[in-house]
Amino acid sequence: MQRALPGARQHLGAILSSASVVVKALCAAVLFLYLLSFAVDTGCLAVTPGYLFPPNFWIWTLATHGLMEQHVWDVAISLATVVVAGRLLEPLWGALELLIFFSVVNVSVGLLGAFAYLLTYMASFNLVYLFTVRIHGALGFLGGVLVALKQTMGDCVVLRVPQVRVSVVPMLLLGLLLLLRLATLLQSPALASYGFGLISSWVYLRFYQRHSRGRGDMADHFAFATFFPEILQPVVGLLANLVHGLLVKVKICQKTVKRYDVGAPSSITISLPGTDPQDAERRRQLALKALNERLKRVEDQSVWPSMDDDEEEAGAKVDSPMPSDKAPTLPGKGAVPESSLITFEAAPPTL
């Protein structure tokens, strides 16, 4: 263990040296708050449901709870999550969008978690759910990063034996955390943070994230039902469509709007908000193929003579006199050969 620490420290330093300011700031905040926990009580930085809502309004905890850790292994998970997000997501989104994503996920996890425990208190009247539960840590952001990786590189293989793709990792980890919770090896706020991180990040990436093609990602491979096994996807898809229709009616979500753009004079580009570039390229190739087939059929038809040309040729043959093989003969005289000279008879003298 002591031999591995210097190598890991050196590797982490090399990664952070090439990271952006956002990644460095988040990692520094995690380390600072962890070291601060040895000197003072940092419980006021975690989301406590009874203190977040009125009359206390500990609003700042929505910004700090995702950075607060109390164990060294939790610090390692937080740093690894931030570094992975910086290496894989920041080149696609940019540093500002990564910071926005981090803020949206953590604020949503804090609000949804506090509201869930408030409902639990209203059902059980147990004050533990209001003033003892503390929501903190990077598991919520970890769930958001895994959802974003499913969106961007879902077909990548994480394990070869057994074969595990990135697209199934979010639900696999959720199942693992659920088993740990049932075995009392994990506290309920950690499981709640991860679950709400999955939901909030998917909603943001699906409907609200801004990019060059519009807003959100309505691709089929990123539908909510794709997070579940194939046998459950039809049922989950039906329920998700019902919920989405309800949210559209109350104007929380917007309808899927198709946008048609003429990309070039030689082709037509049909783009949907959040469409995968590979899908757009495939549609473009199909459109070009269909256009080439139509042009080929038109060229083949132009080779055959038209009916109008046939009728004109037939009419010309009818109007023109048929040449005779023999010249007309006068009775009692021999045949006179044809002559191309034209003779004129002398006109009578005028008076």
Curated annotation (Swiss-Prot):
Predominant location: Golgi
Keywords: Golgi apparatus, Membrane, Phosphoprotein, Transmembrane, Transmembrane helix
Chain positions covered by the region annotation Mediates localization to the Golgi: 206-229
Mode of membrane association: Multi-pass membrane protein
Cytoplasmic side: 1-19, 119-126, 187-351
Residues carrying Phosphothreonine: T329
SMART domains: DUF1751
GO biological process, one term: retrograde vesicle-mediated transport, Golgi to endoplasmic reticulum
Localization: Golgi apparatus, Golgi stack membrane
Superkingdom field: Eukaryota
InterPro entries (alphabetical): Rhomboid-like_sf (IPR035952), TMEM115/Pdh1/Rbl19 (IPR013861)
GO molecular-function terms, A-Z: identical protein binding
Residue spans, topological domain Lumenal: 41-97, 148-165
Signal peptide: none
Transmembrane segments: 20-40, 98-118, 127-147, 166-186
Chain residue ranges for the region called Mediates homooligomerization: 1-205
Family stated for the protein in its record: Belongs to the TMEM115 family.
Record's subunit section: Homooligomer. Interacts with COPB1. May interact with LMAN1. Interacts with the COG complex; probably through COG3.
UniProt-recorded name of the protein: Transmembrane protein 115
Species: Bos taurus
Highest classification ranks of the organism: Eukaryota, Metazoa, Chordata, Craniata, Vertebrata
